[in-house]
């Protein structure tokens, strides 16, 4: 028989038994690993694959095993023969030879009996094994483990001038409560850095492409990410920024979520065209950039951080989804220290495109490495769909089920939960479907003992809890609600993998396409030219993009060229510009028919049929239909397929809806303000931390830097709002009482406190006998500021009423 001899830690065990049994065990482990790896490869479930490392210890006997029961008896017999206490001999022998040793439990019991951060453990040997085993279990508790197994070790200890280093103490990352005029707030490294609650509105297409929901979350004091995936042109971005600036309260800021691996978007937004930094330079209140969909190489990332900081973005975040990517971000943070870097670890239960990595696996594998880097601020997301689950991650209680110390994070990402918010453009029918979708539980018993711990999974190509995992046009896994659109997607994936079925299943494919918001255009060879134009208008109007009208114009001009009686040369078109077709395509078609009645009888030629896909691809914005059934069918259908879920013209059954499978279960309301949704997450954290916090509560003026006064808050604010424009704060980083940057309170108006930031300037004549007083010069620049401690996440705002007097005085000093 094989016995579990020793439990060294939550993940390290020692087995004892006959050599042949242990060898057979190794064979079975390899078989089970192969089976589990196949389940992962086939995307039946995600999480860490069962893959234990087996190593033989250099021993000749199976210690801590029932096989050694006779040896214990023999030891007792020898003890009796030598007149040694037999019961004591039995106890000692059994501990070495027979009994299971739960080393991890014994270490935890020791730490529970005292404050681990004050405990020192001396390892007198032999060797250093015991100290290493102790450190593994005690990781994150602050225990000090000191090697003292050799004379040299002990001699070194006797001459130490400072205390030896301790293991990491993760309790220092535990959240606490601060009492502010805005109410009780949770304090973490994230709130201290940003001044915003540890509940983040994640960037996600399509929900946070539009500015209304982003602005509403920011106005309530939350980190809110504008999704860069939907800012596809400079014109679209300009329009969204204009609306954002209109919706944002003065002193509020948002963040921009950029897709690094999408080279077109990255070049547009931060590469050659730099539309986002240019907007920031003009004062747009965007103060952070989240680099998602890939992690840059080290040198590129370091340069990027420095560039973004210089461009006015004090907050730069990376969004890794694998262990290797997390470690890459750790290296990046180390290279730019002490500059603060945010890391948004996202597990495979996040909505939309997803990995098969479990959030808990990612954190368990890398938490110690992340926490070793003091300038990293840790945010987690993916499957955090309820306020209670969010509180689990903020307090660190999520890790207890794995036998680990508390592993608190500094903030949590919320995405799926806001898809039905009042400010979300999600159509009413889709919102109702989201509420009706049961989703899957975060935790559920699994009959397979080798299944990974952590969250549950929706198998690829199957439906579970009303959610399925399909493939996007990028051939990447994507979560979506189970509906006609998802079923169509599965069929197209099947045909993509078996192209020989394309023709035989053509009618089935067309039927599936026509049940979605992106139907098949139709067989052009069966249509007349007039029917071609009418079908285009029926499927594309109202135009959601101006280039739809451009393509319709070009289609009508093509039809004119075909049906006109003129044989060659140029002719004067009925439709000279977009204005002729934009407002009423049906009127344009009627005009075409009146001028060319033959268009209602002539069939589309093969040449024009071949030209049609070229017209469809004329502009980057895909058309809302599939123009042709060919081997590129999945891309034709899958491109640009998310905006329809925000258009009431389309039924919820026909559109692609992409929530996370776990978080969708937490959606219970329709048209609840996003501030209230995020507020429920925040209040659950406040309640939990208030009950569990080890740290003493403290009073504070604001969350930013846990500032205790308005002056300290002003000096810790990286930006100020100047007449609606975000600009760098000249007093940022200065110490309280700095004589060059004097801050004076000048009044109060309700909850708003009024201050003057007086910047004292040097002049060329300061060393003159009279101190330069006889010379006309600007010796002070005064910036009047308003700060409101009753509002969370609000930066200092320049007082528009008091500003003119200071500007006029400066002009007078300049003019003399």
Language-model-detected regions and their locations in the chain:
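Glycine-rich phosphate/ribose-binding loops and adjacent secondary-structure elements
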Residues: 308-480
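Glycine-rich beta-alpha junction loops
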Residues: 8-11, 19-21, 58-63, 126-128, ...
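Active-site entrance/lid segments in N-terminal catalytic domains of soluble metabolic enzymes
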Residues: 164-373, 593-816
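Glycine- and other small-residue-rich loops at beta-strand/loop junctions that grip anionic moieties
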Residues: 13-14, 57-60, 95-99, 123, ...
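Alpha-helix termini
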Residues: 1, 28-49, 80-84, 113-117, ...
């Amino acid at each position: 028989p094989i016995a579990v001899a020793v439990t060294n830690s939550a993940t390290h065990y020692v087995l004892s038994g006959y050599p042949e049994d242990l060898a057979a065990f190794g064979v079975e482990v390899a078989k089970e690993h192969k089976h589990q790896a196949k389940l992962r490869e086939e995307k039946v479930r995600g999480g860490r694959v069962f893959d234990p490392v087996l190593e033989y210890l250099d021993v000749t006997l199976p210690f801590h095993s029932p096989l050694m029961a006779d040896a214990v008896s023999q030891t007792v017999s020898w003890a009796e023969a030598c007149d040694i206490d037999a019961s004591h001999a039995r106890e000692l022998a059994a501990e070495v030879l027979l009994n299971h040793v739960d080393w991890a439990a014994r270490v935890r019991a020791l730490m529970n009996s005292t404050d681990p951060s004050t405990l020192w453990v001396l390892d007198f040997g032999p060797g250093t094994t015991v100290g290493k085993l102790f450190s593994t279990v005690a990781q994150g508790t602050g225990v000090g483990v000191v090697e003292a197994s050799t004379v040299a070790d002990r001699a070194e200890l006797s001459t130490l001038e400072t205390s030896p280093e301790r293991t990491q103490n993760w309790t220092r990352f535990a959240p606490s409560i601060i009492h502010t005029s805005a109410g009780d707030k949770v304090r973490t490294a994230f709130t201290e850095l940003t001044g915003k609650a540890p509940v983040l509105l994640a960037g996600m297409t399509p929900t946070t492409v539009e500015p209304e929901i982003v602005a509403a979350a920011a106005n309530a004091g939350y980190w809110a990410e504008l999704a860069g995936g939907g800012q596809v042109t400079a014109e679209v971005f300009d329009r969204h920024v204009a609306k954002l600036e209109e919706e944002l309260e003065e002193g509020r800021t948002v963040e921009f979520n950029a897709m690094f691996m999408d080279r077109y978007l990255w070049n547009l937004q931060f590469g050659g065209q730099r539309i986002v930094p240019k907007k920031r330079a003009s004062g747009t209140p965007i103060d952070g950039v989240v680099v998602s969909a890939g992690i840059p190489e080290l040198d590129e990332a370091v340069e990027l951080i420095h560039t973004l900081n210089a461009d006015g973005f004090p907050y730069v975040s990376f969004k890794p989804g694998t262990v290797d990517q997390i470690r890459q971000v750790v290296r990046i943070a180390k290279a730019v220290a002490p500059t603060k870097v945010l890391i948004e670890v996202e597990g495979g239960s996040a909505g939309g495109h997803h990995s098969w990595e479990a959030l808990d696996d990612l954190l368990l594998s890398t938490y110690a490495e992340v926490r070793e880097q003091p300038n990293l601020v840790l945010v987690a997301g993916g499957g955090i769909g309820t306020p209670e689950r969010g509180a689990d991650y903020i307090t660190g209680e999520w890790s207890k089920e794995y036998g680990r110390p508390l592993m608190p994070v500094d903030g949590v990402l919320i995405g799926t939960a806001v898809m039905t918010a009042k400010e979300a453009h999600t159509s009413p029918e889709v919102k109702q479907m989201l509420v009706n979708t049961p989703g899957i539980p975060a935790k559920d018993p699994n009959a397979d003992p080798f299944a990974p711990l952590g969250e549950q999974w929706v198998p690829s190509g199957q439906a579970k809890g009303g959610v399925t995992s399909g493939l996007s046009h990028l051939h990447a896994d994507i979560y979506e609600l189970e509906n006609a659109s998802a079923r169509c997607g599965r069929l197209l994936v099947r045909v993509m993998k078996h192209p020989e079925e394309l023709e035989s299943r053509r009618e089935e494919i067309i039927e599936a396409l026509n049940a979605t918001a992106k139907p098949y255009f139709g067989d052009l060879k069966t249509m007349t030219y007039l029917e071609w134009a009418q079908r285009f208008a029926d499927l594309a109007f109202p135009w959601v993009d101006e280039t739809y009208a451009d393509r319709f114009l070009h289609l009508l001009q093509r039809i004119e060229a075909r049906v006109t009686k003129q044989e060659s040369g140029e002719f004067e078109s009925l439709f000279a510009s977009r204005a002729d077709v934009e407002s009423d395509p049906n009127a344009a078609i009627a005009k075409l028919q009146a001028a060319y009645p033959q268009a209602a009888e002539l069939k589309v030629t093969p040449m024009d049929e071949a030209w049609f896909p070229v017209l469809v691809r004329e502009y980057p914005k895909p058309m809302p239909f599939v123009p042709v059934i060919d081997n590129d069918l999945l891309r034709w259908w899958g491109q640009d397929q998310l905006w329809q879920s925000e258009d009431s013209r389309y039924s919820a059954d026909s559109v692609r809806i992409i929530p996370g499978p776990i978080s969708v279960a937490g959606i219970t309301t329709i048209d609840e303000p996003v501030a209230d949704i995020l507020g429920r997450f925040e209040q659950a954290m406040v309640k939990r931390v208030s009950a569990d916090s080890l740290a003493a509560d403290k009073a504070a003026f604001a969350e930013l830097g846990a500032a205790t006064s308005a002056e300290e808050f002003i000096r810790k604010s990286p930006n100020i709002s100047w007449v609606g424009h975000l600009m760098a704060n000249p007093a940022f980083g200065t110490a309280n009482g700095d004589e060059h940057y004097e801050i004076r309170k000048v009044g109060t108006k309700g909850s708003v406190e009024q201050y003057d930031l007086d910047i004292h300037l040097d002049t060329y004549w300061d060393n003159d006998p009279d101190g330069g007083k006889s010379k006309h010069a600007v010796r002070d620049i005064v910036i009047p500021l308003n700060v409101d401690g009753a509002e969370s996440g609000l930066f200092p705002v320049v007082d528009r009423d008091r500003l003119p007097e200071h500007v006029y005085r400066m002009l007078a000093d300049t003019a003399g």
